[in-house]
Amino acid sequence: MKKYKIGMYGGKFMPFHKGHNYCIETAIKECEKVCVILFYGGDDELRIIKNNKSKYLSVESRIKHLKNIIKKYDNAELYIVDVTKLKKEDGSEDWDAETPLVRKIVGNKLDVVYSSEPSYDPYFKRAYPEAVHRIVDYKREKYPISGEKIRNVKNEKEREKWIM
């Protein structure tokens, strides 16, 4: 029997990299069911794509990479959520507006939310009070990388060593 019944891991995955994969694999080992959610269409995403033409940043590329990972596991499902119209007045992402969309996917019995960011804790406590926030490799010791670091790497070969 696994530690948790239902877990969720969401993100933009820009690009999908080894750290993301490690978090998904951790969730898959610990949960009976894992909902992996790709959010796309936020202003920050559009700004990133405008300034960075990497083939790994397109929505299609991210969906393809996630599908290739998820299909290996019986207890994981991929969901795609368009957040284009869910913005605050200043144009920034509105995670609180996204919460009802996530609830449609995971229901009200979410046991655990996965991330590698302790700073997400206040939002997760507010949005999913019944769930544990499981922080995976927050010091990035196993995979010392982030999407932002990868996007800033100029050398394509260096970038590709982190991408799944």
Feature map (PLM): residue ranges:
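Nucleotidyltransferase catalytic core that binds NTPs
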Residues: 1-164
